[in-house]
Amino acid sequence: MRKLMILLLFGCGGGSAKYHVDDASLASLSMEEKQGIFAAQNEKNQAQAEFESFKANYRNVDHDVDVADNEYKTAKLQLDTAKMNMKNAEQNADVNRKTSAQRDVQVAELGVKAADAKVDWLKKKRKWIGYSQDAAEKHVAEADARAELEKAKLAQAKGIKPDEKFDPMLFEQDYQEKARKYNDARLDAERLKPDVDGKEREYMTQQQAYDQARSNAMTMQH
């Protein structure tokens, strides 16, 4: 449900200002006078590119989560098999097989822990990317509103009235609202990042322990 919600929420991409100034009304003004507008439009383009990047990353990590879920199921199956082999060795009072089976169980348990830690990390990473995508989308809307505000301020300064209902204060209010939403979304994503990094470190530690135990077990078999 969480995955579907994020895809629906972010699928449309981008965002736009609530109020707009007709570019034709500013056509007679110089490029230099429009520098503030161009700067905001450039920021919007960068934010849109960032949004598209997060959207692609979300799809990739979503796939990685599915793969990791399957790896966890495989690890659990290997542990169940190792436990059954150990039980069989105990029932047959086979000391050598029991010792080997106990070692297999210990290795398989570490495999389950590593697989579980990987799923936990990737799900947390997916959530962070979703939040970052949301922030980037709101950044697009904020930059677009700023571009329109720059147009409105320039029109006002030059005594230009693009339409009868033209009110620069409405542009300012729209920009401030979108800037607040972007800032809140950005902070939400930033607050989540340390937890993602922590989960990754936990996974790496568990994976290293599993790899080492598996290597030791293979050495003892030979």
What do these predicted regions represent?
Residues 12-31:
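Bacterial Sec signal peptide processing site at the extreme N-terminus
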Residues 1-13:
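Sec-dependent bacterial lipoprotein signal peptides
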Residues 5-6, 37, 47, 86, ...:
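Sequence-pattern detector for short linear motifs
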Residues 168-222:
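C-terminal amphipathic alpha-helix
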Residues 42-77, 81-84, 180, 187, ...:
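Extended alpha-helical stalk/coiled-coil segments
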Residues 61-172:
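Extended alpha-helical coiled-coil "stalk/arm" regions
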Residues 31-47:
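N-terminal targeting signals for Sec/Tat export/insertion, comprising classic cleavable signal peptides
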